[in-house]
From Swiss-Prot:
It is an enzyme of class 4 (lyase). PANTHER family: IMIDAZOLEGLYCEROL-PHOSPHATE DEHYDRATASE, IMIDAZOLEGLYCEROL-PHOSPHATE DEHYDRATASE HIS7. It comes from Leifsonia xyli subsp. xyli (strain CTCB07). This is Imidazoleglycerol-phosphate dehydratase. Coiled coil: none annotated.
Length: 200
């Protein structure tokens, strides 16, 4: 079994990102994005996916947090893709249904090699809510888009119910984390790459 790790840096005129991860970790994290609620969400992702994650990011947050939030998602997706390797022996698929008080979210992940996102069910107006002083609800979709397209995975995230924007966003990240944890796990019954095509 090879080490499933990745370390990446990304510098643009809008942000600077340093990120490292270990897919076979314990959920340890050290997250500093300069966007506190985003730190909270990424910490939850690491904990519930059992991925060790270190992120240090800076950006033009005096303009908006959008660039920093999306760019971290891009680098996280790239790191996941690199660390997964050829995906031989993996379960490939994962699903989870996660509550957080009144919020309930379902997530399904396929390490398909085909980037796709279906994101549905957030209550009307959710995207305009400001959570934690900096993070708007619309950022949640941007993060899942960035991760899914750069990791080349198929992701479905569906909000089944919920009222509190904090609870909904956090449940989305936790559900995605639990589904990803299943998908990236080794399956002792799987020999080779889990696809009839022979590649993912």
């Amino acid at each position: 079994m090879t080490n499933r790790t990745a370390s990446l840096r990304r510098e643009t005129s809008e942000s600077g990102i340093e990120l490292s991860l270990d897919l076979d970790g314990t959920g340890a994290s050290e997250i500093h994005t300069s966007v506190p609620f985003y730190d909270h969400l990424l910490t939850a992702f690491a904990k519930h996916s059992l991925t060790d994650l270190r992120v240090r990011a800076s950006g033009d947050t005096e303009i908006d947090v959008h660039h920093t939030v999306e760019d971290v998602g891009i680098v996280l997706g790239q790191a996941i893709r690199q660390a997964l390797g050829d995906k031989a022996g993996l379960s490939r698929y994962g699903d989870a249904l996660v509550p957080l008080d009144e919020a309930l979210v379902q997530a399904v992940v396929d390490l398909s090699g085909r980037p796709y996102l279906v994101h549905a069910g957030e209550p009307s107006g959710f995207e305009f809510h400001l959570i934690g002083g900096h993070f708007t609800g619309s950022m949640v979709r941007h993060v899942f888009e960035a991760i899914s397209f750069n990791a080349a995975i198929t992701t479905h995230v569906t909000v089944v119910g919920g009222r509190d924007p904090h609870h909904i966003a956090e449940a989305e990240f936790k559900a995605f984390a639990r589904a990803f944890r299943q998908a990236k796990a080794y399956d002792p019954l799987v020999s080779g790459i889990p696809s009839t095509k022979g590649a993912l």
